[in-house]
A protein has these predicted regions:
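Conserved glycine-rich beta-strand-loop-beta hairpin in the small C-terminal domain of fold type I
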Residues: 289, 306-316, 328-341, 353, ...
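N-terminal "arm"/small-domain region of PLP-dependent enzymes with the aminotransferase-like
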Residues: 2-71, 357-360, 379, 384
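PLP-dependent enzyme catalytic core of the Aspartate aminotransferase-like
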Residues: 1-2, 235-236, 357, 373-420
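Conserved core segment of the aminotransferase class I/II
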Residues: 228-306
Length: 420
């Protein structure tokens, strides 16, 4: 007898949605399409030769380690390297504070598994990272959404949501995905103080913090938390769990991220990871360590910044040249994305259908809102990625997209002749 599989699925799977971005990427595989949809790093800046050399060296010198099971916590030299690397941003951690994960997406899943019971409330930004909503929703999270503006999360709107006692808050302070905004230093202090006042942990997701193209680096929340607690003894206690990744600085295909947290939190996460995949690939961790060593990672990040800064500037210039004046957008100081706001009455989902016919793709904004976080607000927004397309492709793609935008806006009200 054939199994009726749908009757066997766990209750927690019923609310799971496919990633809108993963679905869009199927469309963008067509060669004629210029895609601003995925958050893809530029493949031409991958250090491919460095990886080839590292793979050969690891297999020649340490195959007995690279091809064997490893510690769940991760490859110790890599954990030590990460601790040294993040120290330059003021994060005082030891290797015992670092857990290597299979990308920061696994880190989000492990945190959801650790902290969320069905029905627990999680405070998130509106809009926020789609992958976090997917990870947390599996464990039955309800959401409390707080809006963002050009300075990031509205800290003046945090007190009442925090007073209601969410399990934790999830924030992306640097060059937020999807908005491209950065949480101001003043708001960072306010957020940390309020979280401490109400005893709410913070999950600080920082995949883009090293990709700053202008301005000064701002202190991570985890650093401000240490200052607030008046502790200078390393990362023994604290209210912040910090996440980051090699996906945006080396390559996403190696699937390596990390969690930095107090040892008692790391030990519980280690137990959960053991049940998930035992450990992240030993071979890949050793290769990544070999690639990043001898100051290569720092120099490579400088290259990435130059490339992405140029592409951001090209996109901003093209938007100014081609888009109608009633359409606005953010001017990110780093990261991979900018956020476009259409006038009232416009619909990014319908715009996408028109854009497809012009062979250009983006991500409509509604998928970046929690179910109770006013997703209808997202229908006036679209996320554009500027890292993966070449400057010439960006210019052409924005021109194509402007044609689709003008067609939709003409349906709302006639445009001046010069803008058609």
């Amino acid at each position: 007898m054939s199994t009726a599989w749908t009757s066997r699925y766990a209750q927690r799977t019923k609310g799971i949605r496919s990633s809108a971005i993963r679905e869009l990427l199927k469309f963008t595989q067509r060669p004629e399409v210029i895609s601003f949809a995925g958050g893809l790093p530029a493949s031409e800046v991958f250090p491919s030769e460095r990886f080839r050399e590292a793979c050969c060296k690891v297999l020649e010198q340490k195959p007995h380690l690279a091809l064997q099971y490893g510690a769940t916590e991760g490859y110790e030299p890599l954990r030590e390297m990460i601790a040294r690397h993040i120290a330059r941003y003021g994060i005082k951690a030891k290797s015992e504070n670092v857990l290597i994960t299979s990308g920061s997406q696994q880190a989000l899943d492990l945190i959801g598994k650790l902290l969320i019971n069905s029905g627990d409330r999680v405070l998130v930004e509106a809009p926020t990272y789609l992958g976090a909503l997917q990870a947390f929703s599996v464990y039955g999270a309800d959401y409390v959404s707080v809006p963002c503006d050009e300075d990031g999360l509205r800290s003046d709107m945090l007190e009442n949501p925090l007073r209601s006692g969410p399990k934790f808050m999830y924030v992306l302070p640097n060059f937020q995905n999807p908005g491209g905004t950065t949480l101001s230093e003043g708001r960072r202090h306010e957020l940390v103080l309020l979280a401490d006042k109400y005893g709410i942990p913070i999950v600080e997701d920082d995949p883009y913090g090293q990709l700053r193209y202008e301005g000064e680096h701002l202190p991570p929340l985890v650093v401000l938390d240490r200052e607030n607690l008046r502790r200078d003894d390393g990362y023994s206690i604290g209210n912040v769990i910090y996440l980051s990744t090699f996906s945006k600085t080396l390559a996403p295909g190696i699937r390596l991220g990390w969690i930095v947290a107090p040892p008692e939190v790391i030990s519980k996460l280690v137990q959960l990871k053991q049940g998930a995949d035992l450990h992240s690939s030993t071979f890949v961790q050793m290769v990544a360590h070999e690639v990043a060593r001898d100051n290569f990672l720092d120099e490579h990040i400088k290259l990435i910044r130059r490339v992405y800064r140029e592409r951001r500037d090209v996109m901003l210039e093209a938007l100014t040249q081609h888009f109608p004046p009633e359409v606005t957008w953010t001017r990110p100081k780093g990261g991979l994305f900018l956020w476009v706001t259409l006038p009232t009455g416009a619909d990014a989902q319908k715009l996408f259908e028109t854009a497809v016919r012009e062979n250009v793709a983006f991500v409509p904004g509604d998928c970046f809102y929690a179910p109770n976080g006013h997703p209808e607000e997202g229908r006036r927004h679209l996320r554009l990625n500027f890292s993966s397309a070449s400057p010439d492709q960006i210019r052409e793609g924005i021109h194509r997209l402007s044609i689709a935008v003008k067609k939709q806006l003409e349906g709302l009200h006639p445009l001046p002749a010069g803008m058609r």
